[in-house]
């Protein structure tokens, strides 16, 4: 299953790729199945997306660049008012373990390139 950000294109304030994918996956698959799934994403999930991943029961998240790098790319763009709240901290407050792998320095530049021009 793949998903792109639809926040700007469809004017949905919660339309981050991870949130939308978590919603679609929770409709298509059982919670048990999703607990064995991995969500791959270019940037560290924001607090909202981390919550959606948690509620969908997705078992693992892999991301290329930290959220603070995304903030550097977006600057003060009102479409992305970033929290300074790592997804690991969000998941740590939950009642089940979600494995987090990232950031991955070897792919950080490639992950950042996906966002080039999107937020401007």
Task: Please report, for each region that a protein language model flagged, where it lies by residue.
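RNase H-like nuclease fold core
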Residues: 1-7
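A short acidic, helix-capping loop that chelates divalent metal ions and anchors anionic groups
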Residues: 7-11, 72
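Short, surface-exposed linear segments at secondary-structure transitions and domain or protein termini
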Residues: 10-12, 109-110
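Short HxH-centered metal-ligating active-site micro-motif
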Residues: 13-48
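Zinc-dependent deaminase
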Residues: 52-120
